[in-house]
Amino acid sequence: MVVALLTVMPVETAHAQELQVKFNVNSKQVEGSDKSVFDNLKETVEQWMNDRQWTELQFQKNERIAVTFNVTVVKYDKATNMFECTALIQANRPVYNSAYTTTLYNNKDDNFNFQFAQFDQLNFDDETLGSQLTAMLAYYAYLILGLDLDSFAPLGGTEVLQRCMNLTNNAQSLDFGGWKAFEDSRNRFAIINDYLDEAMKPFRQLQYDYYRLGLDEMANNAERGRTNISTALETGLKKAHEDKPLSLLPMIWTDYKRDELANIYKGKGTQKEKEAVYNILFGINASQSEAWDKVRN
């Protein structure tokens, strides 16, 4: 992923751009509006995010992080160019030595509100932010890049994640929801603030232990990879939940890892290992008990 890992990939020209973004806009709830503004929004955002260099790192073209924004427009006011939306943001990471991709991040933003006029040019820097739209897009770019880098080296995304935190602090003055400190336990502030909290360091370490030592290893040695994942769930996920029980990050993570975890353990591993994993997952997220039952089978 980062420069040190490029040597294992096929030799080709390195590209600066890190993201491959799809920005899907569902405007069915605002029927009667001119659809061209929604098409232009999609095209403008995708071009801006995909052409921008977010870090100094060099990425191979086939290493760019796939990110999808599924945006639902709830209300649109043409007179003020105001969009009220929800967005489901998902990022995927390739698993090395396999054709499998794994979900790196998946979460809903219920305050994805912004102003955009057709043919607007997007401008941004970390200090002035530019606009609510570019601030949100940059927030998710930095967050996802930080998660990705954490998955390739222990705490490897610290610098990028700090940029995300600084952006969030600067966005406190924006007159839009989702940024305010301690207003909501799963808004944009809460996600990055919790992730960088010292008490959540085990959760950050989990990213490396789960992906690099676990999933990436499974293609070579499934038994060793799964054992490493079991250890990561104990020392990373469980410990983070114990150290900061009010953080929703472990629960959000288990929500989007539900099916993957069930598949990793279903019919595999010792019963003792499976019971230990089940107890961790059920203790954090009992609402997914149906999936956790598969872990024990």
Predicted segments, located by residue:
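Bacterial N-terminal signal peptides
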Residues: 1-10
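Sec/Tat signal peptide C-region and signal peptidase I cleavage site
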Residues: 11-16
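Start-of-domain marker
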Residues: 17-84, 95-97
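A cross-kingdom marker for long, charged
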Residues: 24, 211-297
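Second-shell loop/turn segments in exported
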Residues: 28-35, 123-131, 243
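Sec-exported extracytoplasmic/periplasmic mature domains
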Residues: 46-54, 146-150, 262, 266
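Acidic/His-rich structured neighborhood in mature extracellular/periplasmic domains
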Residues: 79-192
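Flexible, glycine-rich surface segments
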Residues: 156-246, 250
